[in-house]
Amino acid sequence: MGCVKLVFFMLYVFLFQLVSSSSLPHLCPEDQALALLQFKNMFTVNPNAFHYCPDITGREIQSYPRTLSWNKSTSCCSWDGVHCDETTGQVIALDLRCSQLQGKFHSNSSLFQLSNLKRLDLSNNNFIGSLISPKFGEFSDLTHLDLSDSSFTGVIPSEISHLSKLHVLLIGDQYGLSIVPHNFEPLLKNLTQLRELNLYEVNLSSTVPSNFSSHLTTLQLSGTGLRGLLPERVFHLSDLEFLDLSYNSQLMVRFPTTKWNSSASLMKLYVHSVNIADRIPESFSHLTSLHELDMGYTNLSGPIPKPLWNLTNIESLDLRYNHLEGPIPQLPIFEKLKKLSLFRNDNLDGGLEFLSFNTQLERLDLSSNSLTGPIPSNISGLQNLECLYLSSNHLNGSIPSWIFSLPSLVELDLSNNTFSGKIQEFKSKTLSAVTLKQNKLKGRIPNSLLNQKNLQLLLLSHNNISGHISSAICNLKTLILLDLGSNNLEGTIPQCVVERNEYLSHLDLSKNRLSGTINTTFSVGNILRVISLHGNKLTGKVPRSMINCKYLTLLDLGNNMLNDTFPNWLGYLFQLKILSLRSNKLHGPIKSSGNTNLFMGLQILDLSSNGFSGNLPERILGNLQTMKEIDESTGFPEYISDPYDIYYNYLTTISTKGQDYDSVRILDSNMIINLSKNRFEGHIPSIIGDLVGLRTLNLSHNVLEGHIPASFQNLSVLESLDLSSNKISGEIPQQLASLTFLEVLNLSHNHLVGCIPKGKQFDSFGNTSYQGNDGLRGFPLSKLCGGEDQVTTPAELDQEEEEEDSPMISWQGVLVGYGCGLVIGLSVIYIMWSTQYPAWFSRMDLKLEHIITTKMKKHKKRY
């Protein structure tokens, strides 16, 4: 009996210890709980603190505020993201990635009181440009440290090198981190246990050291400013699985010609935008584990390297932005190949026969090359294809039915080719982008396109598509870009096309045969940025509901039959940069309120070819704040920015330098005012001279009068000035000769007088710039100004001038001659009367008087 009691007692003690030990993880030390709560209170929780949160595979996950669950009533070991030692209860790991934290991370943070930490992940938060504290180097037991993408800035402290137990160090960020160049090599020297090192976008600005940990499996140094020749030892790290050296334009990479020590382990190799020294060696054939290879923008030239075709386990091969040439060889049987990009190699040519038998291919990009011929119609091995890009080649023929039958197709881009025939019905229900613009396609828009639940881009412009726009288009509730411009569509615009779509950003129905009114209601909260309806037969008024388009940057309603007064309320669209109402039936004076902010962001204002009357809208012209600044940027031309310009270029008619042309992209510096072909009257406001960024000014074919404002001399970058066919009087301001960028000048058919300015650009303008101004003189006209040399042609001499002995007869000479002639004449009279010949004398006297009088009149005109 005693033995039984003893057994039960021992069992009780054992169970008590077991329960006690299992409860230890919940016994968080009070000082550590307090430190965590103090750390929590240093930050706010902002759901927008970080938008992109990747998981370990790179896929986006949802961020959530882990610290909101922290409170005193529970043990810190149960808090979200906190992990404790099962024996001691000490906090040994803190996972706060993607926790929506926002605020300054102070160097004396209570976090540094958690001295037993082994793992610390603060990635994907927003610490608003905080410095990385040297105290991170005091976590002597730390094996994992992730501070990436949390908006840290400044120099990474050298104390990080004290963390000799680190296996994982991730500090990559685009916010402005750097390592002092001479600290990079010592940092690596002490971190001998590293398995993963990620310093992407950290400014290293140094050569690549060779003392990387021999245990490295991941080395990510993209965008770090590395330069010089990459040490070959990097390729011989025997455990290396992932090597990313991309976006180091001063880095030279020479691949080993013999078998690499990492050949069996290397799975990912990214060398995008580095310099590859030689051709791809045969040693690439030994990379039997390689799954992903990115060699875009590496100046590869010649035929596609054969060793790349031997990578039998490759899943993703990216050779875009190179100078590869010749036909694409027949693809081997890549059983695992899912992604292939040869985008923008320019000189890759030949047909597409190589496409067969790649059953796993999901994404194929052959855009921007010189491929020719039709797409083969007998391809049957691409049933897994999700994305197909063949744009900007020389492909022709009809689009084969197998493309429309792809069951999982998500994105299709066949634009900028010469495909013909009809667009067939799509089998896929998962389409998100269909781009078939700039081909020769005809027929109607297939119903299957209008019933997609995820379609975001539908770009069918510049084809020969006909018929009506079905109201079924309103089912596309996820649509962002809709471009049906430059087709033969007719009928009315469905009223619901905007009303039901809260995501629509670009609406382009220009250059069709659409009629009726714009009866769409633009609801409050819409995000439309571009509305282009020009070149149709639309009537009625400009919808007042457009005032709800707060993000609108371009509004082009030109070349229609709209009958309305000027929609002054459009001035409240403060994002508006381009406004074209040209060639309509708009009329009446342009009235404006006293609000000085109206139209302040406009860069292009085109109201030409309407029936506007009254004075020029001086107050609106004075509000054009953007035009009051000169774009002094240099280098590559910058265009009016648009977040979707990679997919879509708006087409709008621009009048500049005396010509109308359709522009698909508009320079950010291109500032234009075109008020021509209206009935404006009165004087030209001198306030236009304040618009110093103006490049083109056209006020022609109105009823303007008065003088050309001298303030125009301030328009120092003006390239085109057209004031023709008005009633402008006075002289051309001499100060206009200082406009050194002026290429086109038209002042014809006015009432200008005086001398034409001389010098610089004015010496290059011809007669047509000034014709129809009878009072103008000077070059290039035949009427010259005083002091200018005159060139007289024989055709300009009349009969009297030919009889002159000298073209320069002075008044003194005439008087002397007349006096002498008088004395002689009196003597002759005496003789004639004496000899009885009065008739002869009378005839001679009359002739002499006529000759002298004529010469005197001619010289009086000349002087």
From Swiss-Prot:
List every stretch annotated C-cap/acidic domain: 760-812
In this UniProt entry, which residues form the Cytoplasmic topological domain(s)? Answer: 834-863
Q: Where are the transmembrane segments?
A: 813-833
- Keyword Disulfide bond found: no
What keywords are assigned to this protein? Cell membrane, Glycoprotein, Leucine-rich repeat, Membrane, Plant defense, Receptor, Repeat, Signal, Transmembrane, Transmembrane helix
Annotated signal sequence range: 1-21
LRR repeat positions: 91-114, 115-138, 140-163, 164-190, 191-213, 214-237, 240-262, 264-286, 287-311, 312-336, 337-357, 358-382, 383-406, 408-428, 429-452, 454-476, 477-500, 502-524, 525-549, 551-572, 573-597, 599-623, 667-690, 691-714, 715-739, 741-759
Fetch the InterPro entries from UniProt: Leu-rich_rpt, Leu-rich_rpt_typical-subtyp, LRR_dom_sf, LRR_N_plant-typ, RLP23-like
* Domain of life according to the entry: Eukaryota
Q: Name one GO cellular component term.
A: plasma membrane
Q: Where in the cell is it found?
A: Cell membrane
Bilayer topology term: Single-pass type I membrane protein
Glycosylation sites noted in the Swiss-Prot or TrEMBL record: 71, 108, 190, 203, 211, 261, 299, 310, 378, 396, 416, 464, 519, 563, 674, 698, 714, 746, 767
Which regions of this chain are Extracellular-facing, per the record's topological domains? 22-812
* Principal subcellular localisation of the protein: membrane
Residues annotated as region N-cap?
24-90
Q: Which GO terms describe its biological process?
A: defense response to fungus
Q: What does this protein do?
A: Involved in plant defense. Confers resistance to the fungal pathogen C.fulvum through recognition of the AVR9 elicitor protein.
Q: In the UniProt entry, what is the domain comment?
A: The extracellular leucine-rich repeats are required for the specificity of the elicitor protein recognition.
Q: Which family does it belong to?
A: Belongs to the RLP family.
PANTHER family, sorted: LEUCINE-RICH REPEAT RECEPTOR PROTEIN KINASE EMS1-LIKE-RELATED, LEUCINE-RICH REPEAT-CONTAINING N-TERMINAL PLANT-TYPE DOMAIN-CONTAINING PROTEIN
> What is the recorded name of this protein?
Receptor-like protein 9DC1
Encoding gene (name): 9DC1
